[in-house]
Amino acid sequence: LTAFWESDRDKAVAFSRDIVERIRASKTASPAARLPDDRKLVMRLIEQAFSLADELQGGFGDQNKFPMSPQLHVLLKLQQREPSPGLHDFLVLTLDQMAGKGLRDQLAGGFFRYTIDPGWETPHYEKMLYNQAQLASLYLFAADVLNRPDYRVVAMDTLDFVLERMRGENGGYISSLSALDEAGVEGGSYLWSRERLASTLSEEELEVALAMWEFPFGTQLPGLALPFAREGESVDPELAEAVRLKLLAERAQRVPPRDTKQLAAWNGLLLKAFAQAAVAFNDEGYAEAAEALARWCLSMWDGRRLSRSNGQAGDASLADYLYVADGLRAWAEVSRQKQYSQTADELIARSWQLFFDDRGWRLGERQLIPGLDGEPAMQDGPMPAPSALAIALGTREQREKALRLGAEAVTGDPFWFASHAWQLFEHEQHAERTDGANEK
């Protein structure tokens, strides 16, 4: 590229402009004359989900397995609204696999980022704050929708792990724990050899450990194992907890490095999870954690601009504004403190000003490539599309405008736009209820 620029600058400029125009043309969307049929959209989303689903091992795809929290959350909402035996069974399978195998740390709690195999056995050992927040919320919701009280334990363990291991300074929570241990071995902080287990536990304790967890030696690294949950074994709870704590004490000697950045968006997701847990468990500890984190979120907002990261430069993105606003609003509903709902409203209004116009959504205030239009709708990624959250939190007029602009993209690929598809469905359902009430 450097040689091209230096040898023929005019041609390079023309070539760049042509690329920009092609990208712009591919993103250009006209507002739909009418919103799509919500029933057909839901059917298409579920069909697409099952076309990608692994119905033997749970999850989506046949190689790496990511939690895909946004899609699972929408599918749970659809299951709650209109129960389906097939969808129920798939959701239970997926959530059981995620909680019981290699994606989840069976000793300390918390989830790894993803697994590198389709059977949920070998994780990429990084632990991300956004995963902990979303999966705690997901399992709390799934416990009610699927009538699985044990999922509440998964949610609680996940949040307790965050409280113990991911607290940062000044009230926020850090971004991640490294996949590598201090010696540079991936998973070294979590894997066990037979020799290490035997030297850590007595014979009786080792029997308890092997009854509680499966140790598939050699499936991770030669001679090493990551413990999986073992079903159907009855172990004395006090003895089981003593063994777990003893293993954790040994593991504390191999603590993974921490990425201490405190990101507004991810902390906003966590604030919502704490607020939900404070209600679900009627727990003062989660309420105190939510209150402290809400105050930290307030400190990131100066009335016109939100800071992206505590103590570091950088413009906040649409995701930062919306996830923080959603977390503050969730805690305001629980705590009844007006300062949090007021700040949430300010963030929501500012996000629409900064990141949306007639051409669509922008993730940041500044485009990486000047001249490109915004996106009519944003796909879900590891986190829900912030544009869909903006629609959920916006005014009726804003929702209508944004939904019409993104309708074509969403209806063409609803699984990848699941959060947007849910907003379309909710909007149309609300309109039907309103029309029905008016007719009466």
Q: Which role does the model predict for each range below?
A:
Residues 114-115, 278-281, 285-286, 302-312:
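Glycine-rich cofactor-pocket loops
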Residues 1-273, 277-280, 404-440:
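Replace the tail clause
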